[in-house]
Curated annotation (Swiss-Prot):
SMART domains: PHD (SM00249). Its main location: nucleus. It comes from Bos taurus. Residues 1-207 are annotated as: SAY. Pfam families: PHD. This is PHD finger protein 10. Keywords: Isopeptide bond, Metal-binding, Neurogenesis, Nucleus, Phosphoprotein, Repeat, Transcription, Transcription regulation, Ubl conjugation, Zinc, Zinc-finger. The modification Phosphoserine is found at S182, S209, S213, S239. InterPro entries: PHF10_PHD_finger_1, Znf_FYVE_PHD, Znf_PHD, Znf_PHD-finger, Znf_RING/FYVE/PHD. A zinc finger (PHD-type) spans 291-348, 350-393.
Length: 410
């Protein structure tokens, strides 16, 4: 609104001084020319400075301080709107009279098909726009942004039907949902006491201990380490007076297998497999020009200065003299009957895992590795220890004839 016209309509001489807080600005030259073309202002007013006011502020001022003027102004606006609608209707009726055409009855079905086709195209475009451009919308009543729900596969009704006892509400109550555990799974659960430790990933590399610590543990006797010994259950199966072949030393209690310090670091070995019994027809591995990992000599000479064949690991390229590995002749003949593993590749026969080296012990007859917790032992036994695969049959007792009543006593 123009400030000059408002002040004239309200009868206020100095409108700017009376209402200085109203927002106002000066009209540009183009705006004055536009108002002159609409006959809103005169040519004299076009040369003068004119000021524009905000319409909403002026109407609020009229409602508060000039209610009579505002009522008169509202009536004038309604008359103008009514006149505009009437003029628009007259123009529309004149256009209809000028463009009046008679529609043939035979073309009505064609027009109906065209109208239906256009309506279908409009609906398809509207739905496509909703799905691509306006998927989410803001709900003015709840002030929540509504997002379309994703598509999910629906199961058949019989698969999702709830039973009469779906879940126990109190401890000990019957329910139809339960899990059946296999014997191997139950060994990991603490029913009375868990028999197995948490399973380890077989693909994880085994932790290798330092070689210096192995040498230090060799002289500790029955202390922790990869020692071999006899448990109470198997100590009676081997006689203490049983002799050993000449040239072989009796293994010390609690001894450990010396690690191959000078051997090259082994590469990624293939997946290990548990070997519980001798493999029929097994042929030992043959590596020409192999060197012992301890004394760094071939089969022509050992650390004792004698020619001695080497034993080879079935998993890697490590080799060693039986005397350097503290092996007896019986043990050497036994390890040739199955794929023998060196200390670097040794795995448990029961679980097939190389982990928990501090709990690994070895049979004194076949040199197979076992975890203490896999065979039900709480700790590594001291002395000699023999696995179940190598347990010897107990000696058959000799039959002694009964003495008669008339027998003589010597």
């Amino acid at each position: 609104m123009l400030q000059e016209q408002v002040s004239e309509y309200l009868g206020v001489t100095s409108f700017k001084r009376k209402y200085p807080d109203l927002e106002r600005r000066d009209l540009s030259h183009k705006e004055k020319l536009y108002l002159r073309e609409l006959n809103v202002i005169t040519e004299t007013q076009c040369t003068l400075g004119l000021t524009a006011l905000r319409s909403d502020e002026v109407i609020d001022l009229m409602i508060k301080e000039y209610p009579a003027k505002h009522a008169e102004y509202s009536v004038i606006l309604q008359e103008k709107e009514r006149q505009r609608i009437t003029d628009h209707y007259k123009e529309y009726s004149q256009m209809q009279q000028q463009n009046t055409q008679k529609v043939e009855a035979s073309k009505v079905p064609e027009y109906i098909k065209k109208a239906a086709k256009k309506a279908a195209e409009f609906n398809s475009n509207l739905n496509r726009e909703r799905m691509e451009e306006r998927r989410a919308y803001f709900d003015l009543q709840t002030h929540v942004i509504q997002v379309p729900q994703g598509k999910y596969k629906v199961l058949p009704t019989e698969r999702t039907k709830v039973s009469s006892y779906p879940v126990a509400l109190i401890p000990g109550q019957f329910q139809e949902y339960y899990k059946r555990y296999s014997p191997d799974e139950l060994r990991y659960l603490p029913l009375n006491t868990a028999l197995y430790e948490p399973p380890l990933d077989p693909e994880l590399p085994a932790l290798e201990s330092d070689g210096d610590s192995d040498d230090a543990e060799d002289g500790r006797g029955d202390e922790k380490g990869k020692s071999k010994g006899t448990s109470d259950s198997s100590s009676g199966n081997v006689s203490e007076g049983e002799g050993l072949p000449e040239g072989q030393e009796e293994p010390l209690p609690g001894r450990q297998r010396p690690r191959d310090k000078a051997a090259a670091p082994r590469k990624d070995a293939p997946k290990r497999s548990a070997l519980s019994k001798a493999v029929p027809g097994h042929k030992p591995k043959v590596i020409p020009n192999a060197l012992c990992g301890i004394c760094l000599k071939g089969k022509e000479s050992s650390r004792r200065g004698k020619a001695e064949p080497l034993v080879h690991c079935s998993q890697c390229d490590n080799s060693g003299h039986p005397s350097c590995l503290d092996m007896t002749m019986e043990l050497v003949s036994m390890i040739k009957t199955y794929p023998w593993q060196c200390m670097e590749c040794k795995t448990c026969i029961i679980c097939g895992q190389p982990h928990h080296e501090e709990e690994m012990m070895f049979c004194d007859v076949c040199d197979r590795g076992y975890h203490t917790f896999c065979v039900g032992l709480g700790a590594i036994p001291s002395g000699r220890w023999i696995c179940d695969c190598c347990q010897r049959a107990p000696p058959t007792p000799r039959k002694v004839g009964r003495r008669g009543k008339n027998s003589k006593e010597g």
